[in-house]
Amino acid sequence: MDKIEKSFGKGSIMKMGEEVVEQVEVIPTGSIALNAALGVGGYPRGRIIEIYGPESSGKTTLAIHAIAEAQKAGGIAAFIDAEHAFDRFYAAKLGVDVDNLFISQPDNGEQALEIAEQLIRSSAIDIIVVDSVAALTPKAEIEGDMGDNKVGLQARLMSQALRKLTSAVSKTRTTCIFINQLREKIGVMFGNPETTTGGNALKFYASVRLDIRGSQQIKDGEEVIGKQTKVKVVKNKVAPPFRKAEFDIMFGEGISHSGEIIDLGADLGIIKKSGSWYSYNDTKLGQGRDAAKQCIADNPELAEELEGLIFEKLREHK
């Protein structure tokens, strides 16, 4: 046993009864509802996470919120921008310290995944986001002609990379988030025709898979200022799956914290709703959800108090 530990490091082999199972370490998602839906309070550390959904559904917003939360706790974050579309000003609005964010804009899929692997193995970072799997184009495809048939190259690349990344993220306790897009399978008559890009490897290696969808638009008069968003935990290896979370994503602001407090507070009976009026104890928050949201946004101390009560209630409901 000593020889194995000397060769492969401490913890490479152990008796089942020796190690006490610790509580799962997490990075918060930036959404109270999603933290609750994940069952452990956020994205588990040392695991691979997949966030997928249609275009403009809020995938990157969700990942950027995770980076902001990791940085708030003193963590170091990296962003692999394979799509070459990272907006530093939007990230800053969501709370990201962009000056201390490591960013890479790789030329091809192999380069992106090799950079990701080296960053993870360095043990220097706490969270890494790859945006997106669909943009991880294999080198052979980039160097080939437009009409060349390169079937399965990307799937093979992802499969090879994930075999290496899985053990690396586990050993270094790094949270690795892959953003993925949806495609439609051709000729599917029955069942769901939607599938994610990059083959099946990510489906298997991911400990958590989140399906994010925009539902209704949020309007201020005629102007669209945000959208209601639904997230389903499709796969979860650290807590029960299939839970759902709903929240507002406001354009230019990200997840609406005050909106979550109103919705969860009302659902849990902390905030009383009488007709169209929302109230907490003897304090009237406003007539209509938007007015109540604004009241919460304007009163940080009240927001903090309500958030504390919501956390307590959610813990009781577990």
From Swiss-Prot:
UniProt GO cellular component terms: cytosol
InterPro entries: AAA+_ATPase (IPR003593), DNA_recomb/repair_RecA (IPR013765), DNA_recomb/repair_RecA_CS (IPR020584), P-loop_NTPase (IPR027417), RecA-like_C (IPR049261), RecA-like_N (IPR049428), RecA_ATP-bd (IPR020588), RecA_C_sf (IPR023400)
Family according to the record: Belongs to the RecA family.
Keyword ATP-binding attributed: yes
Alphabetical keyword list: ATP-binding, Cytoplasm, DNA damage, DNA recombination, DNA repair, DNA-binding, Nucleotide-binding, SOS response
Binding site for ATP: G53, P54, E55, S56, S57, G58, K59, T60
Protein name from the UniProt record: Protein RecA
MF-aspect GO terms: ATP binding; ATP hydrolysis activity; ATP-dependent DNA damage sensor activity; damaged DNA binding; single-stranded DNA binding
Superkingdom, taxonomy of origin: Bacteria
Predominant subcellular localization, coarse grouping: cytoplasm
GO terms classed as biological process: DNA recombination; DNA repair; SOS response
Pfam families: RecA (PF00154), RecA_C (PF21096)
Protein's job: Can catalyze the hydrolysis of ATP in the presence of single-stranded DNA, the ATP-dependent uptake of single-stranded DNA by duplex DNA, and the ATP-dependent hybridization of homologous single-stranded DNAs. It interacts with LexA causing its activation and leading to its autocatalytic cleavage.
Cellular compartment(s): Cytoplasm
NCBIfam families: tigrfam_recA (TIGR02012)
Keyword ATP-binding belongs to the record: yes
